Design a protein with these regions (language model features):
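Intrinsically disordered, low-complexity acidic Ser/Thr-rich regulatory segments
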Residues: 59-76
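N-proximal short alpha-helices
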Residues: 1, 5, 52-55, 59, ...
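Short, charge-rich amphipathic alpha-helices with coiled-coil/heptad character
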Residues: 1-20
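Short acidic DE-rich linear segments
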Residues: 116-123
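Extended alpha-helical coiled-coil "stalk/arm" regions
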Residues: 24-63
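Long amphipathic alpha-helical coiled-coil segments
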Residues: 22, 29-36, 71-108
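Generic detector of low-complexity/intrinsically disordered segments
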Residues: 65-66, 104, 122
Length: 123
């Protein structure tokens, strides 16, 4: 457990990590959207595709062979898990900070009670 005075900076660092991962996630999602838009464009303008089901199948084929798209999807999955872990760590630090503050308050109350008890006894 950290010292009480170290929690705010640790919490700020953990929140910054969540923001960094979130930023990376948005960049990867933007890249995925571009790949999907390109696949939509390719499938929309192929004249031999006669219905929506054929266009969807062609879109799927285009995305399936795109290695960059596959890498981006893997990165998206990894970053999503990383973000969830970062959020869990942030919440853990916040909860630890709350517990540390309560323990500090309890220690102060116990010291005051001990002091008052000694005064009553006349020590």
């Amino acid at each position: 457990m950290l010292q009480l005075s170290h929690y705010p900076s640790a919490i700020a660092q953990a929140a910054q990590r969540v923001n960094e991962v979130d930023s990376q996630l948005m960049a990867v999602q933007h890249q995925i959207n571009r790949f999907e838009g390109n696949a939509d464009r390719i499938s929309a303008f192929e004249s031999d595709l006669k219905n929506d089901a054929q266009r969807k199948a062609r879109r799927f084929e285009v995305l399936l062979v795109n290695q960059e798209y596959q890498k981006s999807m893997d990165t998206l999955i990894r970053l999503t898990a990383e973000k969830q872990n970062a959020i869990a760590h942030l919440e853990y630090l916040r909860n630890q900070f709350s517990v540390a503050k309560l323990e500090a308050r309890l220690a102060i109350v116990q010291q005051l009670n001990d002091f008052e008890a000694r005064e009553l006894v006349g020590l």
